[in-house]
Curated annotation (Swiss-Prot):
<protein>
    <recommendedName>
        <fullName>Extracellular endonuclease</fullName>
        <ecNumber>3.1.21.-</ecNumber>
    </recommendedName>
</protein>
<dbReference type="InterPro" id="IPR044925">
    <property type="entry name" value="His-Me_finger_sf"/>
</dbReference>
<comment type="similarity">
    <text>Belongs to the EndA/NucM nuclease family.</text>
</comment>
<keyword id="KW-0732">Signal</keyword>
<keyword id="KW-0255">Endonuclease</keyword>
<dbReference type="GO" id="GO:0004519">
    <property type="term" value="F:endonuclease activity"/>
</dbReference>
<dbReference type="GO" id="GO:0005576">
    <property type="term" value="C:extracellular region"/>
</dbReference>
<dbReference type="InterPro" id="IPR007346">
    <property type="entry name" value="Endonuclease-I"/>
</dbReference>
<keyword id="KW-0964">Secreted</keyword>
<feature type="compositionally biased region" description="Polar residues">
    <location>
        <begin position="71"/>
        <end position="81"/>
    </location>
</feature>
<dbReference type="Pfam" id="PF04231">
    <property type="entry name" value="Endonuclease_1"/>
</dbReference>
<feature type="region of interest" description="Disordered">
    <location>
        <begin position="69"/>
        <end position="95"/>
    </location>
</feature>
<keyword id="KW-0540">Nuclease</keyword>
<feature type="signal peptide">
    <location>
        <begin position="1"/>
        <end position="19"/>
    </location>
</feature>
<keyword id="KW-0378">Hydrolase</keyword>
Amino acid sequence: MSARFIAVFCLFFTVTAHAQAPRTFSEAKKVAWKLYAPQSTEFYCGCKYNGNRVDLKACGYVPRKNANRADASNGNTSSRPGRSGISASAGKPVGAKTVRATTTCSSAPRRTCTTWCRASVRSMATVTTSVLDGCRCNVGKYGSCLTQVDFKAKKVMPRPSIRGMIARTYFYMSKQYGLRLSKQDRQLYEAWNKTYPVQPWERQRNQTVACVMGRGNEFVGPVNLKACG
């Protein structure tokens, strides 16, 4: 799994006309905190958190350095937008800018695509442990954390419990936004999708996020927008 596929790559870059959908990273971050509060589990290692503090001892996470930062959590997008190659929909406003239909995040101005990506609640991969989040471009072990990072090879192997979600997210982005997947990548994600089927929490998350964004991930399952309060 190459460095650009670190953990979950702007979970479903969904920008819709839904009235409640946030349009900036700040708005998305506020909504995401509320959405993920009941789960209270960060993305990379599955550590529990309370507010912006992570219970490192309970999940066996051992920071490589900067223990103070490791104990903090932050809402963040889980990929580098400039490397994702996601095609933006025509005429979708991105702050004060607009990304044309033929523009991809690999060719558009970094600031433009970053703003577009970060405006989506789906790009918030719960809450991430700060140190591991800061070391996504680097490699090593973090105690009992099952997500492994190989700094030299620039590869990441996410923990088993999130592999299926990662696969279904890529399938969604490939169909909805034209993300190009190599044959090898698609085979890997198909294997993950089969080995790690949709879990109840993933269906619930899909429904909850759909109520905010106005659209669900069909690879996770159907959503009922009429049930949204």
